[in-house]
Swiss-Prot record:
Pathway: Sulfur metabolism; hydrogen sulfide biosynthesis; sulfite from sulfate: step 1/3. This is Sulfate adenylyltransferase. The keyword Protein transport does not apply. SUPFAM superfamilies: Nucleotidylyl transferase, PUA domain-like. Its EC number is 2.7.7.4. It holds the Pfam family ATP-sulfurylase. Belongs to the sulfate adenylyltransferase family. InterPro entries: ATP-Sase_PUA-like_dom, PUA-like_sf, Rossmann-like_a/b/a_fold, SO4_adenylyltransferase_pro, Sulfurylase_cat_dom, Sulphate_adenylyltransferase.
Length: 390
């Protein structure tokens, strides 16, 4: 049994593909040495890839000024579609000055390898403080997302892009499932409702609980850990992926779960990033998206449920993906199971609250997270990694 892929429409109705056809690729390679170059950092490189594979549909390139300003101020594109986070290529004045609008620009990765081209349609200055305050709700440069804005150049380069080649991920090639492939997988399994789960943390019992709650009411679960750029104190992606492999192998029904990597970078934009993450999963073919406590947050910049409440600012049909909102789950010592205030009669003294932050703190102190926090196999994997034994 299969379901129509058209029933799970990408954002804007069409899955964008900006992988250069072979003929164009050869043309770009032939003129590569004659093109002006822009070197991309890790985040811009992952943005380039996400645009090319359709993860950022309907974007075909880095945002022009009208889209950028509407996204920053009103969380929508110039065509009216919801979009909450700017996707821009910011460079210094020195890099921007010689570039001519209407020309091709060679895009190199941080190692200097030619990976894509930009058809330059605009160069424009932008207000860093305005972007920070609107997107991140703060201009505090201690915020990692705000710091990126202030560290990057003052000029945005805009225009459609082409990615020369979709290379296998160096660490997780078997889990590199791009949007066209995930949609096909969902259809082959006959899934009509699919819930996506975003994380940058190792899986703990609270995650497992809300994932399984969601799985009770949909056909399939798409575990989609982010493996792009994150904060330096986040658990490394290879460790997180091993933890997810352990969980899928031992604690989930394999026929109802697909594990794949999300190559995009974290912005730590809290509520706005929750919308962004939901739209990405819509492009991958998900019909539902899990939004938990302080989704995509950092520090104390956002309220516990701000990332859930922001969904109420959009018409459901405009987003086209259903948020599944979960309260902060905890281990209940009274009922001896995972619960939330909706299902547990216990008082605060009988609740063990879990978080990736707490797990990281235990690991840094050389302590094995207790079974209320983490499955034992996952805890062992984490402690091995922290001790440098992996």
């Amino acid at each position: 049994m299969t379901t129509s892929l058209a029933a799970i429409a990408p954002h804007g109705g069409q899955l964008i593909n900006r992988l250069a056809p072979e003929a164009e690729r050869q043309e770009f390679l032939a003129i590569a040495d004659k093109l002006p170059r822009v070197q991309l950092d890790e985040r811009a490189t992952s943005d380039l890839v996400m645009i090319a594979i359709g993860g950022f549909s309907p974007l075909k390139g880095f945002m022009e000024q009208d889209d950028y300003e509407l996204v920053v101020e009103e969380m929508k594109l110039s065509n009216g579609l919801p979009w909450s986070v700017p996707v821009t290529l910011s460079v210094t004045e020195e890099v921007a000055a010689p570039l001519e609008v209407g020309s091709w620009v060679r895009l190199d990765n941080s190692a200097g390898k030619f990976i894509g081209v930009l058809e330059l349609t605009q160069k424009y200055h932008y207000n860093k403080a305005h972007e920070a305050k609107n997107v991140y709700r703060t201009d505090d440069q201690a915020h990692p997302g705000v710091k990126v804005i202030y560290d990057q150049g003052p000029v945005n380069l805009a225009g459609p892009i082409w990615l020369l080649e979709r290379e296998p991920h160096p660490l997780f090639p078997k889990y590199q499932i791009d949007p066209a492939a995930s949609r096909q997988l969902f259809a082959e399994r006959g899934w009509k409702t699919i819930v996506g789960f975003q994380t940058r943390n190792p899986i703990h019992r609270a995650h497992e609980y809300i994932q399984k709650c969601a799985l009770e009411v949909v056909d399939g679960l798409f575990l989609h850990p982010l493996v792009g750029a994150t904060k330096s104190d986040d658990i490394p992606a290879d460790v997180r992926m091993r933890c997810y492999e352990i969980m899928v192998d031992n604690y989930f029904p394999k026929e109802r779960v697909i594990l794949g990597i999300n190559p995009s970078a974290m912005r730590y934009a809290g509520p706005r990033e929750a919308i962004f993450h939901a739209l990405i999963r819509k492009n991958y073919g998900c019909t539902h998206f899990i939004v938990g406590r302080d989704h995509a947050g950092v520090g104390d910049y956002y309220g516990t449920y701000d990332a859930q409440e922001i969904f109420d600012e959009f018409a459901p049909e405009a987003l086209g993906i259903v948020p599944m909102k979960f309260e902060h789950a905890f281990y209940c010592k009274k009922t001896l199971q995972m619960a939330t205030t909706k299902t547990s009669p216990s008082g605060p003294e009988d609740r063990i609250h879990l978080s990736g932050t707490k797990v990281r703190a235990l690991l840094r102190d050389g302590q094995l997270p207790p079974p209320e926090f983490s499955r034992p196999e996952v805890a062992q994997e984490l402690i091995r990694a922290m001790q440098g034994e992996s």
